[in-house]
Amino acid sequence: MKAIKKVLNNIFIDGLSGMALGLFSTLIIGTILKQIGDLMGGTYGTYLSAFAVVAQRLTGAGIGIGVAYKFRESTYVLLSAAAAGMIGAYASNLIAGTLLSDTGALVLSGPGEPLGAFVAAYVGITIGRLVAGKTKLDLLITPAITILSGGAVGILVGPGVSSFMTWLGNLVNWGTEQQPILMGIVVSVIMGMVLTLPISSAALGIILGLNGVAAGAATIGCCCQMIGFAVTSFKDNGVGGLFAQGIGTSMLQIPNITKRPLIWLPPTLASAILGPIAIIGPFHMTNNATGSGMGTSGLVGQIMTYQTMVATESPVLVILKIVVFHFLLPGLLSYVIYRGMRNMGYIKDGQMKLSV
């Protein structure tokens, strides 16, 4: 039982956290820079957009390095995981014979499959670790084993796993369109809680390919957690805690949640209330997969929401909706619930004090 728990923690906590590091450093920042470059135009804008595309295409490598770094792997395993991740990311292209042109040039269309990159990198790292430092030919053996094992599994398993997760994501997207109230609650609450837990909601949103109102509900849930904790814990943590949680991460509250689970209730109830409201009727908040699990962290969720919604709505209206549903209402609703629970004695001063 302990062995199973260790493997699950390895994959879903450390592994996905490492995957998120890679995603932030390539796909997510590349998407933001691409938008800025396109808005700038001209020579400098063109260069910036080109830099962004390079970053996006290296998503698989970033994931491989991020996972290996999180596992504290040796140098050769860490660097070789980049190649394994790239093979896994573009496994479908490799199988289809479209990865190389007739002249032998590498053709990288899009960022590839993030989950395929994770699977290939994880297997390559796990097997590469077994031989790292064990032979006098470590310089050759470890990179070769890491790349070959990860790449092979990436080709064999990656496309199938990615297809299943895409199917599951499409099911969530479709279900949210059909039943926005029920699914709005479910998606908003689950993604918000995942964001606060030591699991990467950003990686989950991208793996599932959330989009449209499903991604909109997911973003609301994440915003409620971050802004909710930032506001409700202000008395305990002041301005520093406000920014650390509001544009950093609500994961900082995990030690306190473990001791006092009731402090998690205000932002979670806010997610359940605002998630469906924000995606129905005239509000129709949407987002893309990249921003769906980011909340207000680095304002990535807001940038992606703007990019997604401005195509069909006026910029001023989109910004107004973002301010109201991503900041004002999550903070206000969480605070109202928090005050009620505090007055009833369920939450007390000092229970949300951060130790950092």
Predicted regions and their residues:
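Pore-lining transmembrane helices
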Residues: M1-V356
